[in-house]
Amino acid sequence: MSRYRGPRLKKIRRLGALPGLTRKTPKSGSNLKKKFNSGKKEQYRIRLQEKQKLRFHYGLTERQLLRYVHIAGKAKRSTGQVLLQLLEMRLDNILFRLGMASTIPGARQLVNHRHILVNGRIVNIPSFRCKPRDIITTKDNQRSKGLVQNYIASSDPGKLPSHLTIDTLEYKGLVNKILDRKWVGLKINELLVVEYYSRQT
C-alpha cells in the first residue's frame, strides 16, 4: 500500500487530529463517528483505527509500518514504546518536532531535496534514524534557510519535546536523548497497534 496523498481533512474527520499530516483539526463533533458493533468486529475496528492513526500521522506506507513493528518486536522492552521511539526518531519527524516544517510531509520534502544536514553531512533519506547528540541543520545557503525560517519563527517553544533543542538563530537542532513516551506528539494507544499486527500473523 502506497503513502497516502489524498484529502487530509477526510482523514482527520475519521481518525481525529493528526498533527504530523496537517495543522487542521476536525470540527467539534464531526470527528470519530462511533459505530457500536458487538464483539470481535468492534474490537477489530478500534485496533484498525489506532493503526491507521499511526500510519497517517507519520506518513508511512503499510509495508514501512509493518517493518517498524517487526523491529520493535525484537527489542527486550515494550514493543509499543519501542515502536513509537523508532518513529519519533525518524529524521522527517525530528524536523517536524523541531518546528523546522509545519507537517511531516513538508519535512520529508526538505530532506528529499537535500536541504538538510545531519552532523555536517547531507542526508536525503526521510527515514534516517537520528540518535542522541546528532546535530540537525540546513545547508548554509539562503534558499535552504529561507525554507525553514518562517516555520521556526512561528513555532511555539513550549511545545518542543524535552529530547530536542533548537537554536532559532542558527537554524540548528540537537537531539539530546531518546524520546520519553509522554512527549509523543500524537494521542495514540500503541498497544492496540501491536495487537492489530499480532492478530494478522
Swiss-Prot record:
Chief place of localization: plastid
Keywords on record: Chloroplast, Plastid, Ribonucleoprotein, Ribosomal protein, RNA-binding, rRNA-binding
Compartment annotation: Plastid, Chloroplast
GO molecular function term, any single one: structural constituent of ribosome
Pfam families: Ribosomal_S4, S4
SMART domains: Ribosomal_S4, S4
Record InterPro entries: Ribosomal_uS4, Ribosomal_uS4_bac-type, Ribosomal_uS4_CS, Ribosomal_uS4_N, S4_RNA-bd, S4_RNA-bd_sf
Stretches assigned to the S4 RNA-binding domain: 89-157
GO cellular component, one term: small ribosomal subunit
Lineage: superkingdom: Eukaryota
One Gene Ontology term from the biological process aspect of the record: translation
Cross-referenced NCBIfam families: PRK05327.1, rpsD_bact
Free-text function comment from the UniProt entry: One of the primary rRNA binding proteins, it binds directly to 16S rRNA where it nucleates assembly of the body of the 30S subunit.
Subunit structure: Part of the 30S ribosomal subunit. Contacts protein S5. The interaction surface between S4 and S5 is involved in control of translational fidelity.
Record-stated family: Belongs to the universal ribosomal protein uS4 family.
Name of protein: Small ribosomal subunit protein uS4c
Organism, as annotated: Hordeum vulgare
Chain's gene name: rps4
